[in-house]
């Protein structure tokens, strides 16, 4: 049973993280009449613009986090980012707080070490060779073990922050320093990963719901500087590779538990798969599902964590997304060129409403649906390029 927003029966959803993904989750909650409270570290974040109330706090501050939760008494707490005081969520969950999908899943996946050890050591899934290190000296030894080239990442970071490639011994010191500056909670432990010789990588959006585990069609994507630039669905795969991918994803989400949508990242080589990472929430590459599916990843997430059945995931056909990337400094961002960008049918522009920019920032996305993937990707890129960001 669900209540009505702003009434004594209200079903309250508290979002921890209020970026563009949280905004879409908030919109789906609004469609069901839920009361939405958005939290982030800064004011006027995208999800705050479509929420009933909002708070700007340091979500790594356990006391500040607990204060907001105690004040609002939400029915569901929905993390959208990694930089959260997860130990406090674990503590509050034991007292009855409903964390999506679970507090432990949120804690485990915010740290690359936790999820890598779960996948590789407990679930025995194939992964790239890896080592965790705490010092520059340990890094030197780890590079010898995994070989060059290799990737170094802070164990707590996202969107490519602090991530770099070590190609020669001369890169080791630079990469170490960069990783220490890029972690979400400051300097600390890093993971060193050997390269996997893969053909392509996918995001397999996997829903764990009251009526079982469901899969979206695989999403392919192109990365640049550690962040996605284009994504498309469905990614063409062999039947054997898809089956392996689904089996691995199901093992991971069942191990994490709870209800919700998980973004499972996998490398594919022929018929073989290698586990990379998992997020217990909607995935940025899944923005394409706003046009490619009957229920977007955000709608699926809300339906699942509120205990409603999924029944089936319907995909409409070849679709793509292309990021609208800003580069500049402004607290008054404007956009032009939308008329030209929307000149083709089955094309949409989503602008996130981010209040400011200082450097490079993802500000929106163009999404398309076409008769074939090549045209969908090409037209999405064309549409995103026609949007002019004015600083």
UniProtKB/Swiss-Prot annotation:
Residues 117-306 form the ATP-grasp domain. Homodimer. The keyword Oxidoreductase does not apply. It catalyses: N(1)-(5-phospho-beta-D-ribosyl)glycinamide + formate + ATP = N(2)-formyl-N(1)-(5-phospho-beta-D-ribosyl)glycinamide + ADP + phosphate + H(+). SUPFAM superfamilies: Glutathione synthetase ATP-binding domain-like, PreATP-grasp domain, Rudiment single hybrid motif. The lineage of its organism: Bacteria, Pseudomonadati, Pseudomonadota, Gammaproteobacteria, Vibrionales. Involved in the de novo purine biosynthesis. Catalyzes the transfer of formate to 5-phospho-ribosyl-glycinamide (GAR), producing 5-phospho-ribosyl-N-formylglycinamide (FGAR). Formate is provided by PurU via hydrolysis of 10-formyl-tetrahydrofolate. GO terms for cellular component: cytosol. It comes from Aliivibrio fischeri (strain ATCC 700601 / ES114). ATP binds at residues 112, 153, 158-163, 193-196, 201. Pathway: Purine metabolism; IMP biosynthesis via de novo pathway; N(2)-formyl-N(1)-(5-phospho-D-ribosyl)glycinamide from N(1)-(5-phospho-D-ribosyl)glycinamide (formate route): step 1/1. It holds the Pfam family RS_preATP-grasp-like. This is Formate-dependent phosphoribosylglycinamide formyltransferase.
């Amino acid at each position: 049973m669900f209540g009505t927003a702003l009434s004594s029966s209200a079903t309250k959803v508290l979002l921890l993280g209020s970026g563009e993904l949280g905004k879409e989750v908030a919109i789906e909650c609004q469609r069901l009449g839920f009361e939405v409270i958005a939290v982030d570290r800064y004011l006027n974040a995208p999800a705050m613009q479509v929420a009933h109330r909002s708070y700007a706090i340091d979500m790594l501050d356990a006391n500040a986090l607990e204060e907001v939760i105690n004040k609002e008494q939400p029915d569901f707490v929905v993390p959208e980012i990694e930089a959260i005081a997860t130990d406090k969520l674990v503590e509050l969950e034991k007292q009855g707080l409903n964390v999506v999908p679970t507090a432990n899943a949120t804690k485990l996946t915010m740290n690359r070490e936790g999820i890598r050890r779960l996948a590789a050591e407990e679930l025995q899934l194939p992964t790239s060779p890896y080592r965790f290190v705490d010092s520059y000296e340990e890094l030197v030894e780890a590079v010898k073990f995994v070989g060059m080239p290799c990737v170094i990442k802070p164990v707590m970071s996202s969107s490519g922050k602090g991530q770099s490639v070590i190609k020669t011994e001369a890169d080791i010191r630079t990469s170490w320093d960069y990783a220490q500056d890029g972690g979400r909670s400051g300097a600390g432990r890093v993971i060193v990963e050997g390269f996997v010789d893969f053909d392509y990588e996918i995001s397999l959006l996997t829903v764990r719901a009251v009526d079982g585990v469901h899969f979206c069609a695989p999403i392919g994507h192109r990365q640049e500087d550690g962040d996605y630039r284009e994504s498309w669905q469905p990614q063409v795969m062999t039947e054997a590779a898809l089956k392996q991918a689904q089996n691995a994803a199901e093992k991971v989400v069942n191990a994490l538990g709870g209800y919700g949508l998980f973004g499972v990242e996998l490398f594919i080589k022929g018929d073989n798969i290698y586990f990379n990472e998992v997020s217990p929430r909607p995935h940025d590459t899944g923005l394409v599902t706003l046009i490619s599916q009957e229920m977007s990843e955000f709608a699926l997430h809300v339906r699942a964590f509120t205990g409603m059945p999924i029944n089936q995931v319907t995909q409409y056909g070849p679709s793509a997304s292309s990021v609208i990337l800003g580069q500049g400094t402004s607290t008054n961002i404007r956009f032009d060129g939308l008329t030209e960008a929307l000149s083709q049918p089955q094309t949409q522009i989503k602008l996130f409403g981010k209040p400011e920019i200082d450097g490079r920032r993802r500000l929106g996305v163009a999404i398309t649906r076409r008769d074939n993937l090549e045209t969908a990707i090409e037209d999405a890129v064309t549409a995103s390029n026609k949007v002019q960001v004015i600083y």
